Curated annotation (Swiss-Prot):
Its EC number is 1.12.-.-. It comes from Anabaena cylindrica. It comes from the Bacteria. This is Soluble hydrogenase 50 kDa subunit. One of its GO terms (cellular component) is cytoplasm.
Length: 14
């Protein structure tokens, strides 16, 4: 799908 896991980005950016 064309969906982005922002949750992972937020956690990773932490």
């Amino acid at each position: 799908x064309e969906e982005f896991d922002y949750d992972l980005v937020i956690i990773g950016a932490g």
